[in-house]
Amino acid sequence: MSDRIRVRYAPSPTGYLHIGNARTALFNYLYAKHYNGDFVIRIEDTDKKRNLEDGETSQFDNLKWLGLDWDESVDKDNGYGPYRQSERQHIYQPLIDQLLAEDKAYKCYMTEEELEAEREAQIARGEMPRYGGQHAHLTEEQRQQFEAEGRQPSIRFRVPQNQTYSFDDMVKGNISFDSNGIGDWVIVKKDGIPTYNFAVAIDDHYMQISDVIRGDDHISNTPKQIMIYEAFGWEPPRFGHMSLIVNEERKKLSKRDGQILQFIEQYRDLGYLPEALFNFIALLGWSPEGEEEIFSKEEFIKIFDEKRLSKSPAFFDKQKLAWVNNQYMKQKDTETVFQLALPHLIKANLIPEVPSEEDLSWGRKLIALYQKEMSYAGEIVPLSEMFFKEMPALGEEEQQVINGEQVPELMTHLFSKLEALEPFEAAEIKKTIKEVQKETGIKGKQLFMPIRVAVTGQMHGPELPNTIEVLGKEKVLNRLKQYK
């Protein structure tokens, strides 16, 4: 095993980048960077039937968007390649042959139907399903007979009996498995493709991976991988298994869970900021010292401590994600937020598909109005409904405000002044409201609340003069005149 910290994120291109996988990649990245080590991306693409055409590209694209820059992968060979499992058969085959020659593995000719019948019988007896070793000691004659029948063999690893496999997990502490509870398992499928637990151990060894950090759904894979290391006399890496991510019902995050968006692509499409998503994911199952929760990537690298990875499940808190992204939104320059929001405004037909300079200028003012409230760029559409829809029916509280005794006088003065106002801009509108205050003697809530309700139909909202400017003179005058 390498003295240098070398970790890997090894996705299958069978789907897009999931929040859970993004977290695995992120913690591996932080661990490597904290110790000035290497972050390696290896593509486990042996499941040809399930691989998506753009699955690999999507993984890389979204990792890059999140800010997870890798040191080695298919595009950066550092002498440990190939970095796609499908291109490593020449590495696996001599090792498979060695295990067969040393009788540490054997060919199994049982059919899927026979294996399923065995499994069902074991379950019916209340036993844990496991392979019973029927083909563990075939004679050469028996093997030839099965091959004459056209049976294709898988290759099984011969599990040593009465042995304990232990490892000191960096998150969970000491974990042990009794080998007698593990049946002889398949290392090469009937189609000649190595299985996950075999290939991953070989790859980790030859790529000199020092630490394997992954979700705790992989704990049961670990003894099988340790068996492979021991069979070849290799030193296993250190293992760390992160707690699951759970939803509001404290159930494991499932890809079928419609309450939570689960793919990085979806957050990109909605206009979340990559540095905000990085920050939020980094706090899913890990916590810094102190109360602060907003950190830059560089700060996370500096303070990351694997000892602070949590044993307890990590709660995916949608409200917290909204809060974190809002913190970053507030700090961003308006132009960046506007460019993120523009596709959403166009999609909602609020800005033309080919916008004029006037449209773009108006859009920038709209964003400036709501930027401090936005949880994500796409939220500009529901937030700014009052600019595009008819005035909503007033609620009871709004009715009380607009029916105030001084409202007709207030609206009459304001209407006449705004009608004559040029340019119709926030600074001038603010002066105009002050003039109305002096002329009428109406001030404070009695001044501002009726104006806001009259032009927006709402009791609260962003800066009133800016809101009036963005609404535009025609719309504002139409709304004011009904209350004169």
Swiss-Prot record:
Residues the record lists as binding ATP: 255
Pfam family, one: tRNA-synt_1c
InterPro entries linked to this entry: aa-tRNA-synth_I_cd-bd (IPR045462), aa-tRNA-synth_I_codon-bd_sub2 (IPR020751), aa-tRNA-synth_I_CS (IPR001412), aa_tRNA-synth_I_cd-bd_sf (IPR008925), Glu-tRNA-ligase_bac/mito (IPR004527), Glu/Gln-tRNA-synth (IPR000924), Glu/Gln-tRNA-synth_Ib_cat-dom (IPR020058), GluQ/Sye (IPR049940)
GO MF entry, a single one: tRNA binding
Reactions this protein catalyses: tRNA(Glu) + L-glutamate + ATP = L-glutamyl-tRNA(Glu) + AMP + diphosphate
E.C. code: 6.1.1.17
Motif position, 'HIGH' region: 11-21
Family annotation (Gene3D superfamilies): 1.10.10.350, HUPs
Principal localisation: cytoplasm
SUPFAM superfamilies in UniProt: An anticodon-binding domain of class I aminoacyl-tRNA synthetases, Nucleotidylyl transferase
Enzyme class: ligase
UniProt entry keywords in alphabetical sequence: Aminoacyl-tRNA synthetase, ATP-binding, Cytoplasm, Ligase, Nucleotide-binding, Protein biosynthesis
GO cellular component: cytosol
Known function: Catalyzes the attachment of glutamate to tRNA(Glu) in a two-step reaction: glutamate is first activated by ATP to form Glu-AMP and then transferred to the acceptor end of tRNA(Glu).
Family, similarity comment: Belongs to the class-I aminoacyl-tRNA synthetase family. Glutamate--tRNA ligase type 1 subfamily.
Protein name: Glutamate--tRNA ligase
Source organism: Staphylococcus aureus (strain NCTC 8325 / PS 47)
Gene name of this polypeptide: gltX
